[in-house]
Amino acid sequence: MDADAILKKDQRRSSLKQRNLLLSMRLNQTTATNGAPPQARVQPGKGYRNPGKVLSPIRNQEMSPGKRPTLEISELKNVSPINQAHKTGKARAGGVPLSKLQNLKLADFEIGKVLGKGKFGRVYCVRHIESGFVCALKAMEKKDIIQYNIEKQFRREVEIQSSLRHPNLTQLYGYFHDEKRVYLLMEYLVNGELYKHLKGRSHFNDVVASYYVYQMADALDYMHERNILHRDIKPENIIIGFNNTIKLTDFGWSVITPKGSKRKTLCGTVDYLSPELIRSREYNEKVDVWALGVLTYELLVGSPPFEEESKELTYKRILKRNLIFPDHVDTEARHLISRLLEYDPGDRIPLKEVKKHPWIEKNKPFW
């Protein structure tokens, strides 16, 4: 049975069987994350973060008639933590030896519900039939990877994510492929996107928000020490696990930047762009620090600080650094946000200082 038939067959399961499957998945799972690609979110009448407001260097290229898509998966060498763990014999996932996950194919998995849909594929909750190991499986069409000219970006995403080991970064276990698709195996988190939780309560209190900001600062500090920029921080790309642990996901725009060098590519989400990105100037890891400031504001207020009806108006507010705080925002939280959102990248607060900021310290005992 080919991959298409397997996916279609599993998606025709009854809702009762789906619920039973997902229940058993939760009982078997000890650590989790979903890695689902972010969904564009829309506010009535505002077109909030609609696809038109998401920037990326992707170009929609037409393929030559009769040209057969070929994706050199073999170029992804030594990037699978599964293979590395198998060699050392030390790593395990959810109590299951990772050697169980060698030489995989789609038929080795039970396919659960769709966790997310993106431009280049879908993410499913799956269970490895033999071991019972539960994870998220991202299925991407090879023809789409080639058509949209993202082979380099795809390889970079896999190589970067597979090299990261941090409690607040989603882990990529490995990948496999067949004739039509590439499949990425990632952690599964049962609690879903941070944005969905934020939307359900309008904003978080200081205790919860400070804990999330601390974790993100630690994760970004870890990445920056390894010369890696994320470049797409936002609530849709953060997943919640057990005990309010959060994990940054979606490394599609991440890039390795040697110490002292800068980037020029414009990418990210409009509301989270820093002034230097908007002005098309060279930038470094401080764009992530700015984005953390926007995230902190959004966690406490419920919307980004510079949000406007159009991209152009949002740009103007960002460049003017027109920062307005509602009355309920704590004074020390305002100070931290202002330090993160300094116009000059060199003036932005270092991430190590973020973790020791008075707003963080006074809320830490209540985590």
From Swiss-Prot:
**What protein family does this chain belong to?**
Belongs to the protein kinase superfamily. Ser/Thr protein kinase family. Aurora subfamily.
Concerning PANTHER family, the annotation shows: SERINE/THREONINE-PROTEIN KINASE IAL-RELATED (PTHR24350)
Q: Which keywords annotate this record? A: ATP-binding, Cell cycle, Centromere, Chromosome, Chromosome partition, Cytoplasm, Cytoskeleton, Kinase, Kinetochore, Nucleotide-binding, Nucleus, Serine/threonine-protein kinase, Transferase
Chief localization: nucleus
What's the name of the protein? Aurora kinase
Q: One GO MF term, please? A: protein serine/threonine kinase activity
State which gene encodes it: IPL1
Which organism's genome codes for this protein?
Eremothecium gossypii (strain ATCC 10895 / CBS 109.51 / FGSC 9923 / NRRL Y-1056)
Subcellular location field: Nucleus; Cytoplasm, Cytoskeleton, Spindle; Chromosome, Centromere, Kinetochore
What taxonomic classification does the UniProt entry list for its organism? Answer: Eukaryota, Fungi, Dikarya, Ascomycota, Saccharomycotina
